[in-house]
């Protein structure tokens, strides 16, 4: 805020005055000695700028004066420390006028022209505060350190006085409109404030500029009327916010001036018609104002050398008779030279300007506070985010005990590594097995622990025994003696092929026939026809159930005798599956077909884009016939589970006098058809009659097997996959002849049996059909759901058995409880007697119930129903259906609407069958509750209390039904609670066998709007009555008596202590007697 004071001196550059070296050096030396810390290479102002040294200086003078020092290297932290230092100085006894302004060390000014002078002046203000602090420290009892040499400051104070004299010299131009204040002698005992924040002094114009971040323009601050006389100042004052002296430390240090002051034009520095020459821009006025600032702070009254002599600045005109009262000179413009310098209007105008400045200062303080709080909240947010980031880093690094959590969250790499490790362990254990049974056990154990999925199977490595030829040892005995039982595990295909085909063919002489091989087949299967049939079919997957299933999962044997030849076939599937029974008809989805023909000796290879045809021609006149068929399994049939079925049947008849080998390498194109044709001459048909389903003519010259490879073939790693076709024709040696497709990285074991002296043709194919896979998945899912359903049913049956067992226990315990309760009742119940008149009243009024009139009798049938219903309800407690039953019971009780427990005590014979097992109210000695009104109406809160199971006597076990009853009351709606009479509440709650039926009471206990007495049942009338609205209790004053001793309770002048115990009114004496007798209470 620019000060409206301006002088000619301000128009020229101001040279900084050299600071008085003795005062600076003394102050720095004293601070270093007291705090024990050095300024180092910092100058005086820089060393004190952060306020840390000042706060430590205060703590050294008086320990604990500054409790917390902010050591952050930020300007706002330094400002906080300086404010704490100034507050501590006040506590040491320094006056506010002796303290410097926080902005004297925290420079926020952006003015360049006055920076040197401003710097020097502010440092002098700091030195003066240190001077007074040293003076206070010398007189402080808690301080015993180095004393400040006050004489070193004399030069500083003298120079400041001299500067003041120069500034206040009357040799000024008329255009120098700066203020000259005369000091009041009343201020001689105190120091003027270096903060320049006196309330009524115009010095406060400068103080705001030293504290604000930006200097507002005079247009903002000096608002006024256009007439230049401030005529709206009076109406403007009530709407201005006056500063809070306690809150605003700047305004708190302003001392008041006792006299009214003359006014100046409110907007005298704004350019207008009446005042055009007086307007000078704000920065120029500010220069002069800041030169005056330190002068105003150091008059003779504030000087330690000036004593009590007031400082005079030349001639002055007192306004009042008081010789010591002073006022400020007028700031006259040329047009206003005639205005009296000490007029009241000017002082009012100055006061108005001060108010405006205070408002601006308050606004600045509010903005600063808001900025601090926003900065603090942002800092807290940043701290929280930093903590969260560190926490996440710890989580990712596995620190801070989070490794346990990570155990359950595995990465994909960990899962794959664990799977591979398991497979390696399985391979090693399988290879090291010493017998077939041990190997089967190992595999079965693995299957039980882990699901053998496609991914697991495709990662199983091919055992070494399957990598060599089986032509020399084709018998099953060789397998039994084989040290490597891994021959049953599937090969590893990388990547897993969508389609894999392995054709293994063994061709033997037609003259050899072994009929004993048919012993291994399950049931006679369909004969094979020479027509093209599917050879590759997918199989559904399921886990084997025993060790034999394990073997059959990998291997299926099928044998058939055709035309005097025995064909033994084995098939290994790409997906593990149980054995399947042969289908009796071919399906339409015949995906892969094979046709085999033999024409002659030359080997012909035809290849085009669509197919590869391999013709192997053998010049042999021996009649031969090749027939190979495979039947496609229908996946959704029950035949999937048949272990003894044959999956495919093949027949190849070959006769040769000498073995011949034909080998060809085929590079597969995408749709590929391989033809292997074996021409045959007329052949003996002596065994044709054995064929049951032969569909081709018997004189068929050739059988064809056509293999169509779909385009879904996944190529292996080798750049050019090969198909090697090898036909060793052996005369009498049982040797396996294999047709291999090595591009699948697989070789399959030759099928044989120890019973077979000759080798028969064999074909092995694997295939994968997405449709079959989907069906297999559906079937597996259905199986899992069925197993889950069965397990759930078993659990339900088990729970039902336990529930029935608990029911029996509950009934037995209930029976014993009834017996114990009956004994207690017989010992403690006192017969209830009523007079004949009250009995008549009972009989006449007991029929008033909701919707129906009921005789006041003991309804034994209802009591039986109640008992059965309670038992039924109790039996269902174990099944978590209490709430439903309680609601049902409460509805039933409301529908009955009758009070079924009527006059149980009229006969004096307690009905044990109607006793509720949880009602312990009758266990009190002497049955005090069976007096005139044993069932004083209970509201829902009472019912909840009376149903508490803790009120049972020592020899009676509490049940769970009281809790159910309390829940029953809680779930009632408030309207239902209001509708129920206290009697009905009690009936819905625990039953008392000795409780007589009170007078008939309607739900609102009123007849035609009249309240009924809870004791005698008659309307209250107009007489005196005792009404307890919260409990729905109403009594005639004569009926308001103790239910035990029958003493009057309403006639006491000084008041009566009435207890309501178990529905009865008890006087204090009876209540204390029953309590001392150890009887339980529900209240």
UniProtKB/Swiss-Prot annotation:
Q: Give all residue intervals belonging to the LIM zinc-binding domain.
A: 1011-1077
Please name the taxonomic classification of the source: Eukaryota, Metazoa, Chordata, Craniata, Vertebrata
* UniProt cross-references to CDD domains, sorted A to Z: CH_LIMCH1, LIM
Q: Which domain of life is it from?
A: Eukaryota
Point out residues bearing the modification Phosphothreonine: 215, 402, 472, 529, 537, 724, 900
Per the record, GO CC terms?
actin cytoskeleton; cytoplasm; stress fiber
**Protein name stated in the entry:** LIM and calponin homology domains-containing protein 1
Q: Where in the cell is it found?
A: Cytoplasm, Cytoskeleton, Stress fiber
Answer yes or no on keyword Nucleotide-binding: no
The organism of origin for this protein:
Homo sapiens
